[in-house]
Each structure stands twice: as structure tokens, then as C-alpha cells.
From Swiss-Prot:
Gene3D superfamilies: 3.90.940.10. GO terms for biological process: DNA-templated transcription. It comes from Pseudomonas fluorescens (strain SBW25). Promotes RNA polymerase assembly. Latches the N- and C-terminal regions of the beta' subunit thereby facilitating its interaction with the beta and alpha subunits. It catalyses: RNA(n) + a ribonucleoside 5'-triphosphate = RNA(n+1) + diphosphate. GO terms for cellular component: DNA-directed RNA polymerase complex. The keyword Transcription applies. InterPro entries: DNA-dir_RNA_pol_omega (IPR003716), Pol_omega/Rpo6/RPB6 (IPR006110), RPB6/omega-like_sf (IPR036161). One of its GO terms (molecular function) is DNA-directed RNA polymerase activity. This is DNA-directed RNA polymerase subunit omega. The keyword Heme does not apply. The RNAP catalytic core consists of 2 alpha, 1 beta, 1 beta' and 1 omega subunit. When a sigma factor is associated with the core the holoenzyme is formed, which can initiate transcription. Its EC number is 2.7.7.6. NCBIfam families: rpoZ.
Length: 87
């Protein structure tokens, strides 16, 4: 298991608060199985893997933001069709 320090992560993130938010979102993605890790898992917890990705410069807010965009237009279109039929 590679040791990750806050200082290693802060080389790629502006401040500690941003580091907390970024690592939390990424760890949640990894824990729920929605995304594959960008580093070797090595039997670590999702939080450690997220921090290792940040420390290696593989993770950024742009990456998280692009991953969170969901195309929801068809869902709303179906809902609107159902509500129009009920009227």
C-alpha cells in the first residue's frame, strides 16, 4: 500500500477544502461501483484510492463534473407525456 499525504494531494488541488470535496465525490463513485479506479486498487478503501488518484494528478473537478452529467431529457419527456394523458 502506497502512503498518501495531504501535501502530495495539495500539489494538484488548490486548498484542503477542495481536496475534501473532490476526494469525497470520487470515493463515492468508486464505492458505488459506478466508476473504475485510475490506479491499482491494492486492497485499499475507496477513500484511499481516491486520494492516490489525486496525488498522482489523475483526478480533477473537470473529470468529476463530466462523469456526473446525465442525459435526462428522455426521462422528462416520458413524464410529460404521462401527465398530459392524465389531464
Amino acid at each position: 500500500m502506497a502512503r498518501v499525504t495531504v501535501e502530495d494531494c495539495l500539489e494538484h488541488v488548490d486548498n484542503r477544502f477542495e481536496l475534501v470535496m473532490l476526494s469525497t465525490k470520487r470515493a463515492r463513485q468508486l464505492a458505488t461501483g459506478g466508476k473504475e479506479p485510475l490506479v491499482q486498487w491494492e486492497n485499499d478503501k475507496p477513500t484511499v484510492v481516491a486520494l492516490r488518484e489525486i496525488a498522482e494528478g489523475l483526478m480533477s473537478y473537470e473529470f468529476i463534473a463530466n462523469a456526473e452529467i446525465v442525459e435526462d431529457e428522455p426521462l422528462f419527456a416520458a413524464f410529460e407525456d404521462e401527465s398530459n394523458e392524465a389531464v
